[in-house]
C-alpha cells in the first residue's frame, strides 16, 4: 500500500507539471518539490540514521534557466533564502537560512528530532542522542568535527527561541 501511495503521488505531481507546462504562466514559474523526510521509507531507517535526512529539493519550471544537478548539503529552513536569492530579494531576516546555490554559503545540513540532533557536511556526518548523551553516528574523513558545531548551532537555536 505504501509503495502504491508513493507511485500515485508521483503520478499526480507529474500530471500537474505536464498540464502546467501548457499554460502561459509556465515561463515565469518555479515549482518547488520537497518530500517529507519522515515518510518512513525504506522501513528500516529510523530517526537516528543519516539516510533518513537525505532528501532532494527539486525546482522545476519555465523560469529555471537550465536543467542541472547541484549536490550541496542544506536543510529545509534553507529553502527560504535559496528561493529569495534566486528572485534577487533580501533574506536577511531568515537568520538561520542560507542560499544553497551560493558557493560562498556554508554547505551543511542540521536537523533535530525529539532528544537528538544531527549535523552533516561533506567531511563529517554526526548524530547525537541528547537524552542518552551519546554519539550515535560519527562518519566521514573529519570524525568528531561536527559534534561541537552541532551543539553550538542547537544552542543558538534555543537562544533565538528564548528571545521571541
Question: Where do the language-model regions lie?
Answer:
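Solvent-exposed soluble domains appended to multi-pass membrane proteins
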Residues: 1-164
Amino acid at each position: 500500500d505504501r509503495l502504491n501511495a508513493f507511485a500515485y503521488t508521483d503520478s499526480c505531481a507529474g500530471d500537474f507539471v505536464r498540464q502546467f507546462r501548457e499554460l502561459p504562466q509556465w515561463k515565469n514559474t518555479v515549482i518547488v518539490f520537497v518530500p517529507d523526510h519522515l515518510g518512513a521509507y525504506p522501513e528500516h531507517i529510523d530517526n537516528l540514521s543519516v539516510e533518513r535526512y537525505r532528501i532532494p529539493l527539486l525546482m522545476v519550471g519555465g523560469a529555471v534557466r537550465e536543467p542541472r544537478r547541484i549536490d550541496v548539503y542544506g536543510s529545509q529552513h534553507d529553502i527560504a533564502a535559496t528561493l529569495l536569492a534566486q528572485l534577487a530579494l533580501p533574506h536577511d531576516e531568515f537568520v538561520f537560512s542560507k542560499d544553497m546555490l551560493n558557493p560562498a554559503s556554508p554547505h551543511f545540513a542540521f536537523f533535530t528530532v525529539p532528544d537528538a540532533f544531527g549535523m552533516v557536511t561533506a567531511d563529517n556526518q554526526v548524530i547525537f542522542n541528547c537524552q542518552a548523551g551519546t554519539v550515535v553516528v560519527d562518519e566521514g574523513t573529519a570524525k568528531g568535527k561536527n559534534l561541537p558545531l552541532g551543539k553550538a548551532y542547537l544552542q543558538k537555536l534555543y537562544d533565538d527561541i528564548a528571545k521571541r
